[in-house]
Amino acid sequence: MREIMKILIITGKLAERKVKDAVKKYDFIDVHVANISVAAFLTPNLIIKEIKKLENKLGKKLKDIYDFVLVTGLIRHDLKNVEEETGIKCFKSTREASDIPILIENLDKIKLSTKEYADLQLLEIIRKKCEEEIKKAEEQELGEGDIKIGKLKVGDKFPMRVLGEIVHAPWLKEKELEEKIIYYLESGADMIDLGMVSNENNADKIKDMLKIARDLTDNPISVDTLNTKELIEAINLGADMILSVDAGNLDELIPYLKDSETAVVVLPTNYKTNYVPETIEGKIKSLEENIKKLIDAGIEKIVADPILEPINNAGCSFIESVIACREFKKRNKLPLFFGVGNVTELFDADSNGVNALLAAIGAEIGANILFTPEASAKCKFSIKELKIASKMMFLAKKRNSLPKDIGYNLINYKDKRFEEEITFNSYNIPIIKAEEDERQILDEGSFKIEIDRKNKEIVAIYFNKRREPVLIIRGKKPKEIYETAIRLNLIKKLDHASYFGRELAKAEIALRIGKKYNQDFDLFL
């Protein structure tokens, strides 16, 4: 009777080397190469044939040699029939050969499936471990320099907190504000910032806005303005934090802050006199002076904001502002505010990589709050990106490792490992150069495709020949939409079917990455 586990892996000819390299350190794993070039083309019937062929060669049933079979590749079929026909359990492996070792090391933690690849379960295991680490850290008591903003612990022992600003909050209708807050919370915001409007006094709207926010969440709510009347109203109404205090309004606010639980973000500026320090030492000196006045007045919940500057900024540069943040943190044991949005909103680049790098810089210099609006379209998903980056950097620092193979990543548009099966060079068959043909035979009707971003759905509106709307098909995935259209006999021409599928795929990509979708126009120019 076998006591040591043995596994057989079945793969195709093209993946043979990758699979064998991936499992070469395991002496209890054998690899069988099926008589097929691409593993993805394997079907249950072909696998059964391969198993029976191998059994004839060995003179034994595979179930007497191996505990189970793993099949590699992007196989679409359920492999349940394989065990029914051969008697040996057969499961799907990981999508990528390079991930097989991770699967092998975690066999005791997952349930192998005949339908689903093992990748998602492996990711869940890694993520669960990460979340447990973070949860354990959240249970720590406050240390030196740490504070509580509302019920949220902020300080060096905890992950960097993400503060999402709702720009021009007083201009939003109640429903719009609610939707924005819900979206920010779903994106992972630890705190919600109600951004006021420059050169306006909307103090009378703060009470209602705070109520709307607090009816939706227990997360801390801050009010962002330099208007002294608005700041006083926010303090009196019990806002969890105010942004911002500087030399110009500090003296007026101290009497109200003394007896409140409101945390205060302090700047090195005096906007009343248009003073903005433009050197590293100037930033630090002014900030320390403003903070000293607050401390002397008995105010303890202080967050320092040396002001992170945009790239290529006139006056104090981005790099100088980073150095100012770092030097201030070295000299002062206070929570540090890091205005990431000052950079991303003024930088024409996809936000995810910029946010990842800025969060990493923030972690190295000791930042505790990552602040961002999602004011421009290019910065959509910034809150979600910063939340992921915060977790990555917290775990990397805790484990004393690089922000790589952590369990979280911000690789959205490329791949960490690039593995493609290329077969076209192996076929000795005619090659036909593709050419467009502008001739089209019109179908009986047509579709207008749109995106419902609120419900995260693709919408296909069907029009008859008279251009009258007839019905709407809604769905999350192109497949369910085009299969519904075919089932309803709305598409009869091949070129229309091809066009419809292409446009649905474009809409799905646009919905997923937050890009604008216009039917008949390329997503990427």
Swiss-Prot record:
Sorted keywords for this record are: Cell membrane, Membrane, Transmembrane, Transmembrane helix
Q: Identify the Pfam families for this entry.
A: DUF6513 (PF20123), Pterin_bind (PF00809), PterinBD-DUF4346 (PF14251)
Q: Which domain of life is it from?
A: Archaea
Report if keyword Cell membrane is assigned: yes
**GO CC: one term?**
cytoplasm
State its location(s). Cell membrane
Q: Note the PROSITE patterns from the entry.
A: PTERIN_BINDING
Annotated coiled-coil positions are: none
**Can you tell me where the transmembrane regions are?**
28-48, 353-373
Described function: Unknown. Does not possess dihydropteroate synthase (DHPS) activity since it does not catalyze the condensation of 6-hydroxymethyl-7,8-dihydropterin pyrophosphate (DHPP) and 4-aminobenzoate to form 7,8-dihydropteroate.
Q: What is this protein called?
A: Uncharacterized protein MJ0107
